[in-house]
Amino acid sequence: FKLRQGVKFHDGTILDAEAVKLSFELGASQDLKRTRRNFFNFVEKIEAADKYTVRFTLKSPMTAFLERLSNGTAAIACPSLLRRAKTKQALAFEACGTGPYKLVRFNPAEELLVERNPDYRVPGLPKFKALRWVPVVENSTRAAMLQTGEAQFIQMAPVEQIPVLKADPNLMVNVVPSVVMRYMSMNMNEKPFDNPKVRQAVNYAINKQALCKVAYSGYARPADGVIPEQIPNAVKLGPWPYDPKKARELLKEAGYPNGFKTTLWSAYNNTTAVKTMQFVQQQLAQVGIKAEARALEAGQRVQVYGNKDPKKAPNRLYIIGWSNSTVDPDWGMRPALYSKNQPPVLNNEAYYQNPKVDALFDQALADTDPAKRAAEYKELQEMVWQDAPWAFLVFEDVTSAANKHLKNFNTLADGSFEFYSAEWQD
């Protein structure tokens, strides 16, 4: 790879091949214990061929290599930060890159404040002196802040208030069909979710079309596959039909004629997530599954991801999601379905293990023949759909709203946003 010359880090040092090499090597270091340190474990070595040339040597053919480089995990950090950050916690609260804004302050519970980078490589950018993000969980509060001018942009515009926001002449609403999958994992290490009939019953018990209306006000669509249709090699397999009678029959066949008790967690506690959790809880109750529901705070999710012994994992039913930021089928599924990616490695909260699925993941990732790769991903998705480690819920839309004077603040299909050229136009 040939690097752009003259690019400076936020600390004033030059981005060169040695900096790129260090960023990837330390990012993948087992000592640092970053959550996604395995993101580039297919790289054999990285070399600085000259000051502005970086050479990657891979362990084997890897068809999604360029897509992986597009992920934020591959962002190049300042050597000075990497050398002093001895833990992943240090990296979580500090930032030093080459982007248009520099980090001033970050407190996850309060705010994220950045200021203009005067050395940004694009002349005339960025336009703002500073940007401030504030976490606001409650939907109506978030909308009110935008309407009163306290905020100029809101991510996750409240779906139930979109008609009101659209009617406000001072605002703009943006809705993007996303690559975000919402699903409910079932811990397959624990009874009764080790029984495929129980997992199938859970899928039949939930009316996905009604869920889209009740929790998302129509700004979602029932999941009709393992990954959204925008992802290459996605296969339409459903959605699972709503059939509570079939669900009760399957529970009876599995040995649970009167249902059972369990726990239902939501990984998020915003208004839409809580509505989703409550709706699913009610649907399950109608077929005899009595679930004690709880929406987790951000810190409580460590209970799931920090657990190192799969046999002691506390989650049973767990509503979460996955956003495929690389728009590649491998990263769209592997983190949550590959057997080696169980917490705390990555996001296989179902503790799903299927050797045939693992083999297909590896074959498809290495196969350079597009037709063979498509066939392998098709078979893989069909197996996952049949095994049903999840209740496949919805593909949600990404919604945002902004003051009409705020331009070039763009919402992306993976739920993130791009604001490099954002400006205020009167």
State where each predicted segment sits.
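Ligand/substrate-recognition segments at binding pockets and active sites
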Residues: 108, 139, 155, 252-324, ...
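Short, well-ordered beta-strand elements
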Residues: 1, 20-24, 54-56, 99-102, ...
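Bilobed periplasmic-binding protein-like "clamshell/Venus-flytrap" ligand-binding domains
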Residues: 63-69, 97, 213, 253-272, ...
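Aromatic- and charge-enriched surface segment that lines or borders ligand/interaction sites
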Residues: 1-33, 49, 55-57, 145, ...
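Surface-exposed binding/hinge segments that line
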Residues: 2, 37-82, 105
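Append "and occasionally in soluble cytosolic enzymes with long acidic Gly/Pro-rich linkers
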Residues: 113-116, 122, 167, 174, ...
